[in-house]
Amino acid sequence: MLTLDKFEEASKIVSEVTLETKLVYSDFLSEKCGNSVYLKPENMQLTGAYKVRGAYYKISTLTPEERKKGLITASAGNHAQGVAYAAKKFGVRATIVMPTTTPLIKVNRTKNLGAEVVLYGDVYDEACAKAYELAKEHGYTFIHPFDDLAVATGQGTIAMEIFKELPLVEYILVPIGGGGLATGVSTLAKLLNPKIKVIGVEPAGANCMQAVSYTHLTLPTTPYV
């Protein structure tokens, strides 16, 4: 369960490896929207994205035995670098399965952070299935990119920083991919201010979350030991 205590704990832990990115006022968007609009530049993190927050906090919650087994995940870029960087900080081995279509620059950046990279499949789902297979075969601990409460808690620390700078914030717009960031940010934001409005944003051509909201859907899962 995501609680305020957990988010406060996560904020302290992720601050060991992340920058507290400061809000940037956007003249253009503020004028266009008729409101004061601020941007939170998480691209300024050392790994280039917010994903390191969830990866680092998740790894911090693992037992020494789980870390010793080695970590594994699947990603085409940002989560890969987040896990690789976090694993290096904890001094543990990380294996990242990336689709063969991943840009070489992302593959090299992940390798440069100390992770072993396995290229497999044309799309993320194929790489993820391979990662689960390797986790089962070698006993690795799987770090899911978004479907994990500890990961979502780490990502949600962004909201803690937003409220610190802008305590009277009324709306937060958060991008939706897998949903980990949106889960963490919306949960913490509502804990801090139940009246706040959190709006998820996704591409019109890839509106998976919106599509699911119109129907009942059972998602397949890949079991592993």
Go through each PLM region and give its residues.
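PLP-dependent amino-acid enzyme catalytic core
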Residues: 1-217, 223
